[in-house]
Curated annotation (Swiss-Prot):
Its EC number is 6.3.5.-. The gene is GTF1. CDD domains: GatF. This protein may be expected to contain an N-terminal transit peptide but none has been predicted. It comes from the Eukaryota. HAMAP family: GatF. Residues 137-165 are annotated as: Disordered. Pfam families: GatF. This is Glutamyl-tRNA(Gln) amidotransferase subunit F, mitochondrial. GO terms for molecular function: ATP binding; glutaminyl-tRNA synthase (glutamine-hydrolyzing) activity. Keywords: ATP-binding, Ligase, Membrane, Mitochondrion, Mitochondrion inner membrane, Nucleotide-binding, Protein biosynthesis. Allows the formation of correctly charged Gln-tRNA(Gln) through the transamidation of misacylated Glu-tRNA(Gln) in the mitochondria. The reaction takes place in the presence of glutamine and ATP through an activated gamma-phospho-Glu-tRNA(Gln). Required for proper protein synthesis within the mitochondrion. It is an enzyme of class 6 (ligase).
Length: 165
């Protein structure tokens, strides 16, 4: 009653049939032999755009909490490496996309709005959040059955200390 149909297309199924690997040494040799290199996918220098400059490198270092006061040659070297990364991302994105372009660059954004710091958490705000925690308890997250009596004692001590200050 049921009709099954299976069809294949040589255009869609591409593969390579290799000889049978008979022992661990053959498997090890096969796995050691590389078939491609990531450097083959890195575009040549003329295809690399200069989206990243020393200003962007300084900003990335500052946002990462690293020392941004590097000598200019070092900043230029970082910018060159990051431009190579962006070009690589674009190249890999283009390999798997029907539309060519700088799709990868949209992922590589350095907008100030992406890095707005949250307002600092004060002790009073933290204590307020702890008081409201019972309103947000979830069975799905396994938050029932936790004994908060010890926790409440410590919180009340901290609260009284904060009020004295």
């Amino acid at each position: 009653m049921f009709l099954r149909q299976f069809s294949t297309s040589p255009a869609l199924l591409k593969g390579k049939v290799l000889p049978e690997l008979k022992n661990a040494q053959e498997i090890s040799q096969f796995l050691r032999k590389s078939t491609w290199n990531v450097h083959d996918l890195i575009p040549s220098k003329e295809h690399i755009t200069n989206e990243v400059d020393s200003r962007v490198v300084r900003k990335m270092l500052r946002l990462s909490g690293l020392d941004e006061n590097l000598p200019e040659p070092e900043l230029n070297r970082w910018a060159e490496m990051l431009n190579t990364h962006v070009a690589f991302i674009n190249h890999v994105s283009d390999l798997h996309s029907s539309t060519k372009g700088e799709i990868g660059s949209s992922v590589f954004r350095l907008l100030a709005s992406d890095h707005k710091p949250e307002s600092p958490l004060t002790l009073k705000e933290l204590l307020r959040q702890v008081d409201e925690i019972s309103d947000h308890v979830s069975d799905q997250r396994g938050e029932r059955g936790f004994d908060t009596s010890e926790l409440r004692t410590r919180i009340n001590r901290a609260k009284s200390t904060a009020e004295k200050e």
